[in-house]
Amino acid sequence: MTDYLRSTALLLVLLNPFLLIVYLIDVVEKLDRKQFAKVLTRAGLIATAVFWFFAVLGDTVFSDVMQAEFASFQIFGGIVFLLIGLQFVFRGPTTIDILRGESQHLAGAIAMPILIGPGTISASVIIGKRHDAIPACGTVLAAVLISILIMIGLKALHDFVRPKREALVQRYIEIAGRITALFVGT
């Protein structure tokens, strides 16, 4: 049981909903709660399917299909995160708009650069090594579900607090954005 909790915590830490909500602040402000929940649920389903794929197939995808070492993928992912962190430092919150791009399908645009990345894929591979296929998939589902539910709750909190405390919300976004730059860059 402890291994399952550790595996869930591993992915949940990487899917940090308190950090992800800052990335999605433009979506939080534009969509109502029902639309936001619908888009985020779709993005969560896309991410879960990708994580399941890597949890079940693991190193096989890298060694046999891509013919690359898993460690090389992790190094590449670190370099990508370093570059994104530098973009956050120099460009601020507009960086996420550049990463996400103009997408007609918002769920896919949220899933790929925000939920699915080198860190979460690596965590899925590690979870797949720790557990058999079905428990690994359950662990991944639990982590993604918890993250999505927390973000929906944060959207509700944002909608409740924003009309009364606009300056406080903007200050939180500014501070969290700076912390994000440090976190992403490390």
Each PLM stretch: what is its role?
Residues I79-R100, G185:
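Transmembrane helix exit motif
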